Amino acid sequence: LPHLGLDSATINDVEFGLIGVPWDAGTTNRSGPRHGPRQMRDLSTMIRAMNGATRIKPFEMANFADLGDAPVNPADIQDCMYRITEFYKKIKSKGIIPMTIGGDHLTSLPVLRALAADEPVGMIHFDAHTDLFESYFDGFKYTHGTPFRRAIEEGLLDPKRVIQIGIRGTMYDGCLLYTSPSPRD
């Protein structure tokens, strides 16, 4: 992918932008997701221009670019989320559809703050965990296990348009599990 900055002369031609968010201050047990954007970029050097099974050449169908990394502050969660949100607002204002690679799950909240600022969005979420906890470790509201609870509370996610696939694992005492008898409920 070509690498472009937001001030590039050709930025308005970009339809899909790859954005790294090298941040993992919201994780409680396994640091390292901040290395995800670099690792994904390193591994993607082997991606071929055409899908062998479908013969589709996605990079000829749309204009993709690597827009670099969102600015982060590893020392301050609130400031970091503000910086990420402001960066994504610029992406949104240019009409670019972001594809985010990055840090821990809390990264989703500032991205949603930018993308859903005008109206709530739906989400298809593939994960082993819901990330809907009220808090972690006696009251911490901004962790890798809480971003979608915060997003719903802030009116960013419409819970009637959220689908979570692959949920498994144990739960903490006192957690509520909400289920629906029908996918339409």
List each model region and its residues:
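Metal-dependent C-N hydrolase catalytic cores
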Residues: 1-121, 164
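Short, structured loop/turn "capping" segments at alpha-beta junctions
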Residues: 158-161
